[in-house]
Amino acid sequence: LARRRLGASAEVLVRTSPCRMGMRSYMTWNEVPAAPLDPILGVNQKFQADTSAEKVNVSIGAYRTDEGKPMVLSCVKKAEALLLEQSDLNKEYLPQRGDATYVQLCQKMLFGEKSKLLASGVVATAQTLSGTGALRLGAEFMKKFAQGKTVYISNPTWGTHNSIMTQAGVPFSHYRYWNAAGRDLDLAGMLEDIEAAPEGSVIMLHAAAHNPTGVDPTTEQWGEIMAVCKAKKHVCWFDSAYQGFATGDLDIDATAMRAFADEGLPLFVSQSFAKNFGLYGERVGTFSITCDTPEAVKAVMSQLDIIIRNLYSNPPKHGADSVEAVLSPPLRAFADARSDPLFRRKHRQDR
């Protein structure tokens, strides 16, 4: 009956149907190759699969209790308890650029309470998905507004720096950093490579506690690096993933970046709270761009809003609320004096 109603065309469809011929007319993804494991996270996956009772996980930089269990900082626990007591607690969407109060507190942590840049309103900052999200946001911004510019990254570096630029389609190269023979900073090689980079390149610098070497320039060496970057009109991209870990002091660890800012060099800054707040799974960070005028900040923020909207729409709220609470009275004093890992690290150094 169906064939009589549809006519001859139905017979043709039946006879030439791919299913009838043992063929498939849609993608099956059988040719997709398996990707290699992430160099860091992949080791953790192997740890989870290992059945040995003697195994020890040192693959991911995360705080653990003496029993090797995940640890939440006391100040973060107190912050979350305070959040639950708030009468206006909500889980609403944040704007693309994030929570305004959180952003202001993060800016002060990076640039300082008395920053002239912040007082002048010339720092554009957006909340991001931790440091990795900040790096990707910066790369996407570069792809739109700094086409053809190359990012110069230290050799060695955190491996994901390279892959983020690759995935975003941003060209990158490397400058010398580690002197293997002397087990210290290869300052001469670093300066030579930065000076050889085309004028107006983007130089990525680790703000403190260089990953993976742990070797940071001295104050005098930072001055030499800054002089070359200024002479070549480079944009300096500070990745601040470990603020407080190098010296135990948040302000001291931001000294180099603040000096570059005070000198008027254009900056990108990626900030992460995964390590120094132990908020690994909350994905809390920021991305900042220093500008010449408040009007330029408005334009830059509008473009960051668009990029964020099309990457992940808007950032998560809970982790930012926790950071905001810890950086605000009275928890800021509690964190500084009692439970902050930075305090404990400084205490060990003092002993």
At which residue positions do the language-model features occur?
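N-terminal mitochondrial targeting presequence
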Residues: L1-Y26
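Conserved core segment of the aminotransferase class I/II
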Residues: L105, D262-A337
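Class I S-adenosyl-L-methionine-dependent methyltransferase catalytic core
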Residues: K143, T150, S163-T166, R309-P315, ...
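Walker B catalytic acidic pair
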Residues: S240
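Conserved PLP-binding catalytic core of the aspartate aminotransferase-like
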Residues: A335-R351
